[in-house]
Amino acid sequence: MVSVLGAVRRGALGMLLLAAALPAFAAKPAHYVLGDVSARTPGKVEPGLLLMGGGDRNFEAMRWFMKKAGNGHIVVLRASQAGEIGEEFFNEVGGIASVETYVFSDRESASDPAVLRSLKRADGIFLAGGDQSRYVRYWRGTPVGAALDAHVRAGKPLGGTSAGLAMQGEYLYGAMDGGSVISPHALADPLGPDNTIETDFLQLALLKGVITDTHFSERNRLGRL
């Protein structure tokens, strides 16, 4: 009986240890791929920053971005929805060898080796729209944040729309209050806890000293800057 109980206890302990280890393997973002990621980049890769306000996509601007990326391999980062934006880039904008989309749901995924390999080989990186507070929480001070800076330093283009634009300035509205403060509330208490201006995210020389945000008139946001 004693030996049986001991075996049961050891088995239970082993299951607990396994359960404790599982999150380390589960921290992987959703991944969507279109095209051939091993194909040769057709054109010359050049530096460039694309800042899109959001809403309807400007295809002329997107084609400029794809050309800056040598019409090669694009990696899209986001923290909501799925791979639709990659389908749009590949099937509607067109003219690229491949597009990979990673959808993050936690900070741990920003250390995933597969993500970092994709970012290192990317000809262009695009930050999708969404909730910029997730981007701050998931990417600031992580290997993904460092990879974005390294990408730009290497002379490759970086783009973003809406929240993905907001993340590019040296200073940005982070929406860390759990909402999206509007002008009357921000101006009533400009130094209050709802006015979350963040920094120490990306270190882009062209946007040094610049604060970025979007949807000013449509969503009554100008006062929060």
Regions found by a protein language model. Name each.
Residues 1-15:
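Bacterial N-terminal signal peptides that target proteins for export
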Residues 225:
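Active-site-adjacent alpha/beta core region of enzyme catalytic domains
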